[in-house]
Amino acid sequence: MKRKLSWMCAAVIGLSAFPAFITAAAPATPPLINAEPTEPAQSPATQAPVVAQTTPSREVKLTFAQIAPPPGSMALRGVNPNGGIEFGMRSDEVASKAVLNLEYTPSPSLLPVQSQLKVYLNDELMGVLPVTKEQLGKKTLAQVPINPLFITDFNRVRLEFVGHYRDVCENPASSTLWLDIGRNSVLDLTYNMLAVNNDLSHFPVPFFDPRDNRPVTLPIVFADMPDLAQQQAASIVASWFGSRAGWRGQRFPVLYNHLPDRNAIVFATNDRRPDFLRDHPAVNAPVIEMMSHPDNPYVKLLVVFGRDDKDLLQAAKGIAQGNILFRGSSVVVNDVKPLLARKPYDAPNWVRTDRPVTFGELKTYEEQLQSSGLEPAPINVSLNLPPDLYLLRSNGIDMDLNYRYTSPPTKDSSRLDISLNNQFLQAFSLNSTQETNRLLLRLPVLQGLLDGKTDVSIPALKLGAMNQLRFDFRYMNPMPGGSVDNCITFQPVPNHVVIGDDSTIDFSKYYHFIAMPDLRAFANAGFPFSRMADLSDTLAVMPKSPTEAQMETLLNTVGAIGGQTGFPAINLAITDDSAQIADKDADLLIIGAIPGKLKDDKRIDLLVQATQSWVKTPMRQTAFPSIMPDEADRAADAQSTVTASGPMAAVVGFQSPFNDQRSVIALLADSPRGYQLLNDAVNDSGKRAAMFGSVAVIRESGVHSLRVGDIYYVGHLPWFERLWYALANHPVLLAVLAALSVVLLAWVLWRLLRILSRRRLDPDHE
């Protein structure tokens, strides 16, 4: 019903606008020169339909800096004339108006009128912007109306550059053929909300919509201050939504007995429920119900009901592991029974480390491993690895690469470049031998494709927790050209390249060992908690009376870990009793304040209180997170105590005093504004990237990290690997030991040879 209404609205828009859109396209195409603002040409194609005027609407500005490939600007050239942006539309909304505001600069060498910029939406031509003489070499503003009839769940705006710099004998690869699209270009959209039925068969829509590229903001509502079981249930739900949000990011504002004005999750029992549910009938089982907001029928609430806290936990696990069975306005979660225990390092978002992994398993969309064009776009593969993978003495990571490509017409310098994290690794020539062409013609692939199979050794020290493997197929394409009297013309044909799904990469031969504390591992991969994807080795320590801000910090943190692992925290344990932390073999996640049993520990390098805080600073601070200073530079040089009224937060890591293989991560703040800074940092990928070492201080100015104090090691290495690791930072000692070993070995051999010589000369001598 919802989708039918969406199409009905779109049809009304399109049918009323289509004739006027054709006639209005011409006056809308002349761009603005030198960024002089003018009112956009109005046409019925870009007006909200009458049917949508009484429904709630929202206006969205999508800048190219936000949604275009980094850095947001585009350089369209003769051999690579296409650029584009992508955006989605929520299933509970319909677009009623769309305008593309372009900022671009054409090359001064272009021929006016013959050169132009074509704008497509989902391969439908929306408008043409001819390049005029006045625009050459100057920044130009133009507005192109977009017919909302063509806006669907997933959309692509494609910009095609048609460039000419001479009348005859052009070279498409000429450096004078270019048009730059500015990162300040904006797509203005107006969305109208659709009334959605209370039907859980679409779950998690509308609470999370995969078509929406924005960070997920999902308020969590409690009747009052939640107890430990309710905190655990909310953590399970938040981590599951975080696992679905993934790269988008997530935030979970917490409200006590107060409803937000947007879609939200509500936790309630028969005895403890928000005021708006006072008249709701009592339940006799764990129930998940979708209902409308009492003040706004366009806003939906997912109410997690239960007779008691035990029911809430069961319902939360039902959301995380049984939602594929949801339908109707409510469901009863009868049972959630685990069948297999999770294993270390089995997070779904991490590359497997127990066997070789195929590239087909690493794909995130169907055509990721192929590309086409005169200059095929790079093929990218993401590798998310456990941050404690020990690669120090590795000769490289084995990768068995199978690839196919269009044969170069001649033997030239066409090649395949392989890069890791923007660092060049290796190049391979693209062959054009006749034997290979004949062999491949017998294979069930596109005619004219060559096949290559290459073993690549990846320098292991370049790998981190999040990695990008890139394959660039670079062709030396023959181009038309010449002079007016001797012109060579032909039609260039696109090249096709494919990385085989059966290509493999192998991380199964490596140990798990890491130097701690390492806040970069926590910020980028949720480590050490994410070692077990279900957080079964994690104990969260909360205040006895958590505030809304402290609860939000807990939910944001477990949501971020869920986004990094791809699995909900169904076995997370939570306590507010500091006496229990010494008895549990677990990594500790502390929210709010460090318990008294840990506060006086010498391992702590920073402490944040209401108005007073102190910090230890190292002898010498490194400027780069990847550089590990030696022990003398890490030593605490001074301890400073400051009293201030401004907000501050911090993330502190140190070794657990109860188990030398366990770690403590404390998220601290001195005020409500401090918790806001802390939550902003947890949800901001740029601020998380600034966290490293043992201390990250968060202020209004940003995040500042320190690597101070002793380090400890988590994981296991065989004795010989541990010996090499210990000697790696002491080359002089290693040289002395090597020399002594050589002398000792020579002496042993000398003694052995003397004994053998005596026996040979005197057989009777014992």
Q: What does each model-identified segment do?
A:
Residues 10-20:
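Bacterial N-terminal signal peptides
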Residues 26-766:
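Solvent-exposed alpha-helical segments and adjacent loops
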Residues 1-11:
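Bacterial N-terminal signal peptides that target proteins for export
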Residues 2-3, 18-31:
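N-terminal acidic, proline/glycine-rich, low-complexity intrinsically disordered segments
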